[in-house]
Amino acid sequence: MRGARAVIDLRAIGYNYNLIRELLDEKNPDAHILCILKANAYGHGAVEVAQFLAKYCSAEGFGVASIEEALELRLSGIQNRILLLEGFFTDEDELSLIDKYNFSITIHCEEQLKSFMNYPFKKPVEVHLKLDSGMNRLGFTPAEYADKYRLLKNHKNVSGIVKATHFAFADIPEKSEYTLKQWRIFEKAAGCLPDPLSAGGGVIVVGWLNTIHMDWLRTGSMLYGLDPYDLDAKAPELPKPLIPAMKLMSTIVCVKHVEKDQPIGYGGAYVTTRDSLIGVVAIGYGDGFPQVRNGCPVIINGKRVPTVGKVCMDMLAIDVTDVPDVKRGDDVVLWGNPELTIEEVSTFSNENPFEIITGLTRRVPLQYTF
């Protein structure tokens, strides 16, 4: 078997969930957490993560991007609330599935609103009514929001309304004024209306709970131990560190002696500066590993060593000259140790950590520890 695999620590996800819950309880103990599982739970396996959170953390609900993601969870036995974060894309087919499987939906535009109100649902649906408070992506304007709310409030298709928005700069403390501006817009447009408030993302629990009161908090990256802040941000520290849930690993497929001044890999993007031992690792961009620059660290036999040359589709090369007794079959950690985070790896590429971790392909099997 090829050595590439992603090891998912479900206990770490549980720890991160409980940390978010603990932070919420300090300021807003009545708030609920909506766990975001879109993009296969940020590459961690949506079904397995949902089953774990439902069973061991009593998670109240999950958010996904599409009807396909929602069906995967429901058909695996998940009975918790499942919210379609973008609502529905087509009308008849999706609305019938929403009705059949009791999904909650987001409504963010006039076309969705009309289709929803005209559909003959057998049972009413929970609606998250989206306000565009300054993200300028999805949602009704502040001027029209109250009217849309009133249309839905007593409609036969609606079991309940959650008022929702999304903050554009919550992960960048230097942009705190814009986040406050969005909150004031949201509060003015929706705060006077009954029903709960909802916002994303989870980083709100770090620095905003004294200012922003939410009944539902949508959180994704923090569940998986990813740094919720922009990499360049001067961010406050969490009272306890998050634990990364994924360790990406593979194995050495061969070790080669390469003389000084020899090119490594396609295009000779690296040339040896000494007589070297080069390890070839069974992972590449076909697995979703990013095209990192020379010098990106990996860990082998407990030591950090650099990548050399371009990442190929199925392989990459590392310089193991200074690591004794490296041999075929030795494990290599690409990210996930406390000493090597995906955030550090991302600084050697043109992708951010979320792009990288959700980009792993089906060639990388997920293995779970608990």
Curated annotation (Swiss-Prot):
CDD domains in the cross-refs: PLPDE_III_AR_proteobact
Modified residues (N6-(pyridoxal phosphate)lysine): 38
EC number: 5.1.1.1
Annotated GO MF terms: alanine racemase activity; pyridoxal phosphate binding
Cofactor: pyridoxal 5'-phosphate
UniProt keyword terms in alphabetical order: Isomerase, Pyridoxal phosphate
Pfam families named among the record's database cross-references: Ala_racemase_C, Ala_racemase_N
Catalytic residue list: 38, 266
Protein name in UniProt: Putative alanine racemase 2
Keyword Ribonucleoprotein: no
Gene this protein is translated from: alr2
Record field: catalytic activity: L-alanine = D-alanine
Keyword Isomerase tagged: yes
GO annotation, cellular component aspect: cytosol
Record family assignment: Belongs to the alanine racemase family.
One GO-annotated biological process of the protein: alanine metabolic process
